[in-house]
Swiss-Prot record:
Keyword list, A-Z: Cytoplasm, Exonuclease, Hydrolase, Nuclease
A GO cellular-component term linked to this record: cytosol
Gene3D superfamilies linked to this entry: Exonuclease VII, small subunit
GO biological process: DNA catabolic process
Record text on subunit structure and interactions: Heterooligomer composed of large and small subunits.
Source species: Bradyrhizobium sp. (strain ORS 278)
Protein's name according to its UniProt entry: Exodeoxyribonuclease 7 small subunit
């Protein structure tokens, strides 16, 4: 895949990347795409998948739970334990 295509994928928001990835999956599942084009869009799909995973990891790292005092007022944040 061309470097400019990878750079293009790195600029996409999560929503845009997942939307395009879903479109690629549908096209490949339909089976009406010529072989060479299938390979090309599959490669782009892989790059989109990696982008979505990267953005999800970043979001997960930023998620924090709000801590409160006895009266229920927010007192700060702490890392969210997702286990």
């Amino acid at each position: 895949m061309a470097d400019n295509t990878v750079a293009d994928v790195k600029k996409l928001s999560f929503e845009r990347a997942i939307e395009e990835l879903e479109s690629i999956v549908k096209r490949l599942e339909d089976g009406k795409v010529p072989l060479e084009e299938s390979v090309t869009i599959y490669e782009r799909g892989e790059a989109l998948k990696r982008r979505c995973e990267e953005l999800l990891r970043q979001a997960e790292a930023r998620v924090e739970k709000i801590t409160t005092d006895a009266s229920g007022r927010a007192t700060g944040t702490a890392p969210l334990d997702v286990q």
